[in-house]
Amino acid sequence: VIFGALARYAFVILSWYSKGSIITVVLQVTCGLGSEVEREVIPMIEDETYRGWHAMAPKLEDDSIAETTLTGESLLENPLLNKGSAFTEAERRELGLLGLLPPHVATMEQQLARTYENYRRKTSDLERYIFLASLQDRNETLFYRLLQEHIREMSPIVYTPEVGEACENYSHIYRRARGLYISYPQRDDIETILRNASHRHIRVIVVTDGERILGLGDLGLGGMDIPVGKLALYTLCAGIHPATTLPIMLDTGTNNPTLLNDPLYLGWRHERVRGPAYDAFIEAFVRGARNAFPDAVLQWEDFAKDNARRLLDRYREDVRSFNDDIQGTGAVTLAGLLAAMDVVGSTLREQRIVALGAGSAATGICEQIVAAMVGEGMTQRDARAAIWLVDSHGLVHDGRSDLDASKGIYAQPNDRVAGWEIATPGHFSLEDVVRAVHPTVLIGTAALPGAFSETIVREMARRTQRPIIFPLSNPTVKSEAAPADLIAWTEGRAIVATGSPFADVIYDGRTFQIGQCNNMFIFPGVGLGVIASGARLVTNSMFVSAARALSACSPARSSPGQALYPPLEEVRTVSRRVALAVAAAAVDEGLAEPLAPPDLDARIRETMWEPRYASVRHVTRQ
């Protein structure tokens, strides 16, 4: 034991000298990476050395010590270290905090009670969002503990649906910068900007250009709250330490005239950059991110349809990256369908699926369904033929000349629609398709409120004993139908999941729980699984594995009337199971170190951070 400890100390010391430069890692233990070596030898080393020697360090039961050079008000301004009134008397003396805080030393429970009391005083969801954002900027540990305690109440505030309103008002409620902003005029400074990030050991990056924010369209720089919110969910749901996350806004302009004419707009006041110039900008960003943060998982978020699929396909083989709008939405929807199959006692290959909306979310859902059907023994051609895609111009079929590649693969042959009775010649509406196809599954991603009309739903229910209906559009006002209507129009036979949160439905004396088809059940676990396994790439099969892991957690499988998706209170357990499935898939594909499931699970558990206060110690910069 003594020899091993001496060897580790020697390794660290030699690493310092070999690197030729020294930096201070001020937050080593609160990142959940504590070890005896880290506490005894202050890690003043560059990231590559840190990664190299940390793997040799023994994991201790107590990860509760953080060392920092910060003191006084500078320490209180650091949200990752600040404990506010919870700093102990000894810490206040050591860290230069005497007199800077009220004399009472509070417990976290007291802080939580006070904070929640103030939160409840807010009279609008936007005020609640601002309150929580301010708490995050002041004390991240308390912020995440509060979210854990009230996840069902607060997750719709920190992310969908309320984050949409926050994005729309971003330049008017802006208080403090978080993450990195890279505007097109700064394209020659991308590497410099990336190296200005507050932390070097970044594990997850979420990046957007703000062009397609939820169902709200082009919100320019205001889209920055999407990466911020997504990364908050990575921490809340999967325990990814906030110091290892980085939100990034790629500001390539905006075509939103309201923003361009707003005197308070904080973004680059210019029409959006397109074509080769845009592609070169993205290429420079990806290259810079890969150099600055070689171990990070890159998540593309809320890019417009024309770019989302193209960028995913362009970079998925080069960097560990995925698009949650495409792959995450597809996986979480597939999980709900798999759970519904258990409820109705059927299989995917027996379904007739109609999907309204043909954007990146819809095609991502179709892609995951096809992959699962192929896994059940269908050919890819037959699987695609079971899906009837309807966009703003009607049914996607061979007779149309306006189809891009992502839609074209789902185009139905003309002979399958010949002879249909349709209301408008040459146009196959959603109602026409439902009447002719007799779908068993109806999915909506078109952000058209009321699109699933009573006529359409009753027609579907007339032909299908247990219609499966997923109105998935966000925010709530964009939902294709209200669950209460769907339950009533089908006499209580519909199996419903929604994209936005809805209350339980009481019909004919029975209570129907409405599960939220929420990506937060998928993407945090995917990121955690990739990080813990060290997978070199993120693949579609990992998302199918994630979907199957999530479907296994469905309450509806064992109890009629229960939701298709687990309660949000169980999301950390779900994320761990999803992560294990993803890590195992990475091993099976030869993309990660060949570890057995128990070893992968141990890595996953070690990676997950819990929001609890560390004991803060002052150290002197060498």
Over which residues does each language-model region extend?
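Flexible, glycine/charged-enriched surface loops at secondary-structure junctions
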Residues: 244, 295-301, 347-351, 376-385, ...
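Glycine-rich phosphate/diphosphate-binding loop of Rossmann-like nucleotide-binding domains
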Residues: 323-441
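N-terminal ligand-binding/catalytic initiation module
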Residues: 45-321, 585, 611-622
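Adenosine-phosphate binding glycine-rich loop
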Residues: 81-82, 322-328, 341-344, 467, ...
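Long hydrophobic segments that form regular secondary structure
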Residues: 426-491, 534
